[in-house]
């Protein structure tokens, strides 16, 4: 273990009493908004897991997506949040047995290898390290650390990601709004804004979205919407209008309902693409598999429940799909995944002796 260039982050290891006899694992969920690190003790593998789970510490930091803030800033954020979690738990790096880092922007083996190399400079050589996309943490939060099934994330963006028990994986969507993340919060809201402009021009039908969106944004006319949109076209800012679209659909607006119905079809098609490529449904199309559903777009509303409608579409083709809404956050899922993978490797090493 080298003294990393950010060695001052770890100064607490020399200043506090550490419970070195208590082995721990770290689970990280890193995204464009925030990064969460969970520190948990090593637990004997059991079914079911203890409830509540014994979380020793939780730490939060900023963005850790290297595509958004650059590699140096992303590394510093990840290292700081891990140090904070260990400090809060009264542990240090010598107590760590496994780390699962699930972060957005890790989409290629070269991304994984770059982060693994950096992590190896921080932790002792015996620590097991696992680097994944943040969708994996979301899946593990629903399966309690088991890497099997499909996860559908629909928040500002969207992605469907699946794994088989023999290690195969596949994804659909998740390419960003320019390449068509329709069904995401950004996609839904962008279509609503487009509908308002079309109605204003006379190229589209009248819609309640016009008055409701203008009122929400405190604008006096649809012409002002153009300036508002391009003043800051950030994905999250646009996606924040989704509740307005849902409320208009619930009030019976045809245009808003059409937008949401198309979003449901897009989200369902992403899941179906992953299920088909991996054969999660079995040869007969009826086999059980967990479908973890995460993100604000999929949360239940008064009458227009997008998540429920997506599940209705999927169930017609795959009756074995079981919808799961996680009870723990993705960082806990990452920690449980680290625990499961660590235990598997321990068993394999024991058999080789």
What are these regions (language model features)?
Residues 30, 103, 135:
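Residues immediately flanking
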Residues 81, 97, 103-107:
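Membrane helical hairpin/interfacial module
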Residues 1-96, 120-123, 143-145, 149, ...:
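ATP-binding/phosphotransfer module of carbohydrate and carboxylate kinases, centering on a glycine-rich
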Residues 106-211:
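Phosphate-binding/catalytic loop of phosphoryl-transfer enzymes
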Residues 102-106, 154, 251, 315:
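N-terminal loops that bind phosphate or other acidic moieties
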Residues 100, 173-176, 305:
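Short acidic, glycine/Ser/Thr-rich loop/turn "cap" segments at secondary-structure junctions
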